[in-house]
Structure formats: C-alpha cells, structure tokens
Amino acid sequence: MAESIRTFSLQWRILSLIIALLVYFPILSGSYFKPFNVSYDHRALIIAGKRRMLVSAGIHYPRATPEMWSDLIAKSKEGGADVVQTYVFWNGHEPVKGQYNFEGRYDLVKFVKLIGSSGLYLHLRIGPYVCAEWNFGGFPVWLRDIPGIEFRTDNEPFKKEMQKFVTKIVDLMREAKLFCWQGGPIIMLQIENEYGDVEKSYGQKGKDYVKWAASMALGLGAGVPWVMCKQTDAPENIIDACNGYYCDGFKPNSRTKPVLWTEDWDGWYTKWGGSLPHRPAEDLAFAVARFYQRGGSFQNYYMYFGGTNFGRTSGGPFYITSYDYDAPLDEYGLRSEPKWGHLKDLHAAIKLCEPALVAADAPQYRKLGSKQEAHIYHGDGETGGKVCAAFLANIDEHKSAHVKFNGQSYTLPPWSVSILPDCRHVAFNTAKVGAQTSVKTVESARPSLGSMSILQKVVRQDNVSYISKSWMALKEPIGIWGENNFTFQGLLEHLNVTKDRSDYLWHKTRISVSEDDISFWKKNGPNSTVSIDSMRDVLRVFVNKQLAGSIVGHWVKAVQPVRFIQGNNDLLLLTQTVGLQNYGAFLEKDGAGFRGKAKLTGFKNGDLDLSKSSWTYQVGLKGEADKIYTVEHNEKAEWSTLETDASPSIFMWYKTYFDPPAGTDPVVLNLESMGRGQAWVNGQHIGRYWNIISQKDGCDRTCDYRGAYNSDKCTTNCGKPTQTRYHVPRSWLKPSSNLLVLFEETGGNPFKISVKTVTAGILCGQVSESHYPPLRKWSTPDYINGTMSINSVAPEVHLHCEDGHVISSIEFASYGTPRGSCDGFSIGKCHASNSLSIVSEACKGRNSCFIEVSNTAFISDPCSGTLKTLAVMSRCSPSQNMSDLSF
C-alpha cells in the first residue's frame, strides 16, 4: 500500500505539472477560445450561435490572494459552473484620483486570464457601484470631495468620473483581448447595481441617470450584452435581471429578454455581534431547480466563494472580517459539504436537461396536485431526434406528495423538485442529499520542517499551542501625537478630515474649570456630561488622557459622563469608523463621526457648546503613520518586552515572530484572547478583529429546510464570539520568522493567541438504496447506447478529501439500518458485519472513493425486505503523512 501511495504521489505531481502547462500556455498565447459572439433571445443567452443554460460562480478577486485564484476557479468548474462572476472594485483600483492599481489582489487582468485558461466564461459587473458589503460600496472616498458631486444620479461631476472609470475597465479588457469576440472569456457586462432599490429617492433625475448609464455603457463598443440587476425600467437594449433568495417568478421587462438571476443569495453576510447565517443545501437547490423549471437560463451564486475582507475593505458599518457567506466554498477555499456536492449534482442534472431546455421556447405546464406541478421541455435535438426533460415540483412545505406523470408514479418530498432528464427517470431531487458532509477541523500548528529549533518558543497549556511566549509591546499615544495636526473652530466631519486613510480621528479641546464649578458639582452631585446629537461607529471620550468611556452605534445619541479637575483640562474625543456605509441613496452625504450639536453639560453657568469650540485634529495613530506593522519599519519603534503577567491595557501595539504550520492547509490566527483592534502579518493587513459575543437567542435548535428562507432562519453560533479565527493566506507567510503585529484598542492577552490550520478533517456519507443513481452514469456509453437501464444502477456513497489529503481512517461504516448523523453514527438492528472492511478496502489511502450501496457490494443481504442505508464516517489527513500509517 505504501508503494501505491508513492506511485499516486508521483502521478499527482506529473498531473499537476501537465495541468500547469495547459493553464500557462493559453495565458502566453493570449487566446482561450476560438473567437465567438454572444447575443440573446427571449429564452437564453446565445453563445456561438447556440442557446445555453448557464451556471455561474460568484468570486470576488480581492477577497482572495492571486495564489488562491486558480484553485477557486478549478473548484468552481468541478462543481459544475460555466461562468465566473465578479464585481470590479473602483476604490481598490483607483485609491487616489488618477492613480490606478492593478497589482496583487487587484490584478484584474490576471484573474480574467485565469478564468479563460480554465475554459470558463466571465460575467464582469463593472458597476462601478457594487454594494457587496464592501467599504463605501466600492466608491473611492476622494469622489465625495469633488465640488457639486451627487452619486448615482443625473449629476455631471459624478457621470464624468463614472464614465472615465467604466471606460478604463472596458479599454483594459479590450487591450488584453479578453472579450469573447477576441477569444477571451468575457460574455457579459453589468452597468450600475441594484439601482431600482434607491431610484425613487432621486425622482426624475434618477430615471434620467438610468437612461444615461445604459447609453454610456452601450457606447463603449464592448461587443457583449449589458445587464442591469433589480432595474425594472432598464432600457430595451439592456437586460434587466433578478437578485434574491428566489427568482423563479421573475419576468424581465420585455419579452425579447431572457430570464437572468445575477445574485442567488446562498447565505448572508454577518455583523459584529451577530449570529452566523446558514442556508440549507436542500432549499438552495430547490430555488435553483425552480428557476430553471420555470424558464430561467442564467443563474449566479452570490457567493460561490465569499473570502475575506482583508485590511479595511469591509463595509457596513460593523461587517465582520470574514465574508464566508455560507457559500459552497468557504472563506479559505475549502468545499463546504454537503452544499458544494449537492449543488454539483444539481448542476449535472440540469446539464443533462440542457438539450431539451434550449430546444423549447417555453415549457408545457401541467398541474399534478393542489401544490404540485410539472414543467415539460421538449423539441428537436441538435443532433436529430426528439429531446424531453421534465421538472416535477412539490411546493407544499409540510407533506410529501405521490403524483402521476406520463403514466408513472413519483414520490415528491415536501418543498422539493425532481428532475427527469428523459421525462421518465429521476436523476435528482433537491431534498435528497447524497453528497458527503464535511466537518471542518481546526488544529494547532505543527511546525514546518526545518523549524524545530524554535519549538521552545511554543507554550503548551490545555492542549493548545500558543503562537509565542515572547512578545514585545509599545504604547500608542493618547491624543495629539504628531506635527501634522491642525486646529479649527468647530467640529469637522470625520471623513472630510481623514479621507478614510485611517479608521481613527483625534479631536482635542481645552476645558477650563473654575473653583465655582467644582463647588457646584460637590453640592449638586454628578459631574459634567458630553452630549452629542448623533455619532457613528465608535466614540471614545478621554479627559486628561484618561478614558472616561466609549459608545458604539450607528447614528446614535452619545451621552458620556466625565469628571474634570479645577483648572485646564484636555477633552479628547476619538472617533472611529468600522467600515463605511455601502448601501442606500445619497452615500456621499452619509459621512462619519458626528452629526448635529455637541455640548458639555453640568457647568454652573450653563452648557458649553462644543460645536463652536476650537479643536485640534490628528488623523490616525502614530503606529500607523510610522508603519511599525511592516517588516521594514517595525524595528525603528521603541518596543519593550511584555511580561507574561502584564495586565491588559488599552491602545497597545504588540509584536512577535512565528513560524508557519507545516503543510498546505489554510492558516488562521485565533484571537479570542484579544479585545478589539487590527492585525498584520509581514506587513499584510489581515483585517479588523473584535471579540464580541453574539446574542444568546435567535438560533434554531434544528434547521428545517422546508419553507421560504430568510437571513434569520437556521442561524448558528448564538451566545458565542461572532469571529475568533482570522485567515492568514499561505502566500503571505515566509518559511520562518513571520512578523505578527496587533493594535489592541480595549485590552487583551497576546500570550494566548494561537496559530492553527483548518481542513475538512472528517467526511461522512449516508445514502440509502432508494437514492438516485450517480449522475455520472447518465453519460456512460452503455446508457447512451441503450444497453444499460438507469434503473439498474445502484446509488453510491462518494467520499472526497481536499487536494493533498487522503482518507487515513474509516471511523464508522454500516450497511443496514444505521442510526444518527455525522460524528454520531451508531449501528442499528440491521448491520452487515463486513461493512468496515469493505469500505476501508475501497477508501483508505485514497483521495476519493466510491462505494456502491447494494447487497452485491457487501456480498450478501443483511436483512432481506428492509430498505438499507450505508453510513460512513472517515478522516482525512495530509498525504505526506500516509507513509507513517500501517495498513
């Protein structure tokens, strides 16, 4: 067996080299397809003269590193996607007016070329407003400083900048020969984004803006169709598309346009202090199947991969650093099972139906019951002969239904769709999950080879490996710290001062307290109070550099008691943003910091109007300005050794060095011991962190897939920290001595920070004899030639570790009537005694395996006349460790 594993490893390396060469060649040649045109009719997009049913995977390139892109694209294709969809992020590409950035995570051309080299198409959503839970909705903050500007309306300054950027992107794609008519992957573009949600706020100017945006886009000569999503008044030559949890009832505003679903929300975003969203795979598959059943032709998962809001890119306010979104690929690019696998099966079933779906101009409708219906597609196939496909739906949320269709009986589980690619046999039902379930395991770091000498730096306690026992600390100054401050009479709006170069803005004023004030307070009780009509997101109030208190909220009234001493006192206000507003009308007016009046109450002679006081302003932190989080500049700061018994302190910088974990599994920092702040590794900004507990109530004990989904249904993680693990991409790590720097705002213990790896360590499969046959069997020559009946094919359990991993052990296997679910299986009354040995022989030491669910596979029938199920629980381990295992 060890020899076979070594052979497998060699074969895998050779295969990887071949794949790399195949990918690299078209990138060099600049051509990915034979040039083709894209048009559309009422039924579908027409690609190279043929109607297509398309599945799209939403991937935002800046939410991953370039080193991750190829794997994400490959897994999307493996999962059945035809298209990748992404926004274009204006504030990432033009952070300073006229200065463009197309490097690193913003190397858009490279991302598009990788998509083309994989054989997938691209839907490029230029916007340039994107929403996307992205900082300021993708708009660069400098845009709001242009005199007279109003965003997203018939406003000349805005239209000028928008046209300039959209033209820049279209020209960039054309110059790189990335449009389909040039042999590239781009088949469709988008202008604006969900403008219909806010259009009424702008009146007639909004309607005029829609017409202008469409005309401007079409005038660029991109040569592919343009769409507008959630735009019922989209002009005739722009396709209006649907966004939402369900779009099977959507109809475009013209009979000449196809039904497109640009955002299928397969999960939801998360706010600090919120629970985690979860959309069941069964409901998501139901929504997609219903969409194609009722005439849809293009559907995109928002998101297929969510990724990470690195740096300060998260929008909000208060959106967390993780953008996992409960997507089919998780934040790190690992498959989320069973969602990824169940959707892969769904896509395969839809592809089997595609000849019939494109042959018919519209489906034939047939009522099967009070809440049951069929849609039948039939016509002439491209290669001759008749084609037929049918979708049987049961929209009853509670009861299964037995229906008759074409003379045959079918059982439809509640809230499900059965897909019949030949109008006779069921290839897939949305409520019957045959895909494996994966359980993500988070493991303490194993030092990489060659780094064993630093093991003494790792502290072990309660089976936790902490990142380091050696930390340095540096106190961030409270208040004005540099010469680049300025003084102004009155309170200024936060963004007008910071230009979003930092989350933080210091305000300082001098408060004079008389002896009479002191006597007045002694006689009348409490001291003075800072009162501000409205503030966002975080306000901290200091008196003479001592923290008086803090307030968190979104445009909430701020009232903070303060205590002064007699004489002159420094009143310091620190405002802080936690992601700029990314959704809504009039974004340019939203701003940050304070609104309304600010006053200081409780003085003997009355309130003090702080709005008219003289204030000194300082943007950002001294540590930020000195770039002490970078490898180049951190040694210039005056760090001191942090004692292990040091008390938590506010406004502290911490640094240490660590070696990366061995292997290729995704790396995370566990920051549960910290309070709130920001983190950097080797100068790369990991993002904001915040150890805030979600509400205790609101999570369902059980998640029922049946019935319409919303973001509050099936949530998880109630009563726990919203986020504790923060992704550190492997490409940002060096072989040893990686610099970790944190800025801690509220107080935490860096000695309990740990570095961990995440992988799909546990796989489970549970499939019964009544399950449908594997989708791949429909494409075998025996079935196509008619020498095999699909009904004679047994279902299978399919187990598949992540790349670079193999099945190291079978923890449980039972063919019969097993009880329980993944990580909790037990043997039932009926059990084939050879289950464990049969499954182990088929799977152990392999990256993936198939086990037939049949008496034949297990040699005999353990309980005649009983419907049997195969349940398996296995573990995956890195393949390089397999040589240490005995078989």
From Swiss-Prot:
**SUPFAM superfamilies named among the record's database cross-references:** (Trans)glycosidases (SSF51445), Galactose-binding domain-like (SSF49785)
State the superkingdom. Eukaryota
**Signal peptide residue numbers:** 1-30
Q: Which Pfam families match?
A: BetaGal_gal-bd, GHD, Glyco_hydro_35, SUEL_Lectin
Q: Start and end of every SUEL-type lectin domain?
A: 791-877
Where is the protein situated, by its record's location annotation?
Secreted, Extracellular space, Apoplast
Q: What is its EC number?
A: 3.2.1.23
- Glycosylation, residue list: N37, N463, N485, N496, N527, N785, N881
Instruction: List the molecular function annotations (GO) for this entry.
Output: beta-galactosidase activity; carbohydrate binding
Return one Gene Ontology term, BP aspect.
carbohydrate metabolic process
The protein's matches in InterPro entries, at most eight in alphabetical order, are given as: BetaGal_gal-bd, Galactose-bd-like_sf, GHD, Gly_Hdrlase_35_cat, Glyco_hydro_35_CS, Glycoside_Hdrlase_35, Glycoside_hydrolase_SF, Lectin_gal-bd_dom
Q: Which family does it belong to?
A: Belongs to the glycosyl hydrolase 35 family.
The protein depicted here goes by the name: Beta-galactosidase 9
Q: Which reaction does it catalyse?
A: Hydrolysis of terminal non-reducing beta-D-galactose residues in beta-D-galactosides
